[in-house]
Regions:
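An N-cap/entry alpha-helix motif that binds or orients negatively charged groups
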Residues: 1-11, 19, 23-41
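Glycine-rich, proline-tolerant flexible connector loops at the mouths of alpha/beta enzymes
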Residues: 53-78, 99-112, 172-181
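Non-globular sequence segments
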Residues: 100-162
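Catalytic domains of carbohydrate-active enzymes, especially glycoside hydrolases
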Residues: 38-60, 161-171
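Alpha-helix-loop-beta-strand connector modules within alpha/beta enzyme cores
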Residues: 69-95
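Structural preference for beta-strand elements that scaffold enzyme active sites
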Residues: 18-20, 51-53, 94-96, 170-171
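A non-catalytic, amphipathic alpha-helix used as a structural packing/dimerization or gating element
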Residues: 41, 45, 80-83, 87, ...
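Conserved, mostly hydrophobic/aromatic
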Residues: 21, 46, 88, 97
């Protein structure tokens, strides 16, 4: 029987154990949805896990669906995530950034200029969403136009590139090869 606390090799990546910390939205980002020192400390304290999966990080301003979630679409956010990553690495941990766009699960209070959220279709979700003003009913999103897809894909690629540091490339490429085999 495999011990949960034994190392695990995935291609060229060695995890210190088989514990993976799942994504948890913390709502602790600062002004401009920038990861703060508190975010860095939170993840650093959990560096003993074999791998940390971060809270979901929106790829663009329109991708936010909760207040104070750290994005990966501005230079300040990228710098904030670098501090988080450096803190985890300094504590001997491994960390992977989860990228996302919430689609219709948002509210105009969380969108640039108070615009309606954008989603694949104009279907209003049931329920409520937390905003800085408190709980709000979901609204009907605006359907994404086909012509908008290339720009949205480009934003996702830019977010991936922002998260794809030299260190990440060194670790993720072997991991991707290991997963394929």
């Amino acid at each position: 029987m495999t011990d949960l606390f034994s190392p695990l090799r995935l291609g060229a990546i060695e995890l210190s154990n088989r514990v993976v910390m799942s994504s948890l939205t913390r709502n602790r980002a600062g002004e401009g949805n920038v990861p703060t020192e508190l975010v860095a400390e939170y993840y650093r304290q959990r560096a003993s896990a074999g791998l940390i999966l971060t809270e979901a990080s929106p790829i663009c301003a329109e991708g936010h669906g909760y207040p104070r979630t750290p994005g990966i679409h501005t230079a300040a956010q990228v710098a904030g995530w670098k501090k988080v990553t450096d803190a985890v690495h300094a504590a001997g941990g491994r960390i992977a950034l989860q990228l996302w766009h919430v689609g219709r699960i948002s509210h105009p209070d969380l969108q640039p200029g108070g615009a309606a959220p954008v989603a694949p279709s104009a279907l209003r979700p049931a329920g409520q969403v937390m905003t800085l003003k408190g709980m709000q009913e979901y609204v009907t999103p605006r359907a994404l136009e086909t012509a908008e897809l290339p720009a949205l894909v480009a934003r996702g690629i830019n977010a991936l590139r922002s998260a794809w540091t030299k260190t990440a490339r060194r670790h993720v490429r072997p991991f991707a090869r290991a997963v394929r085999t």
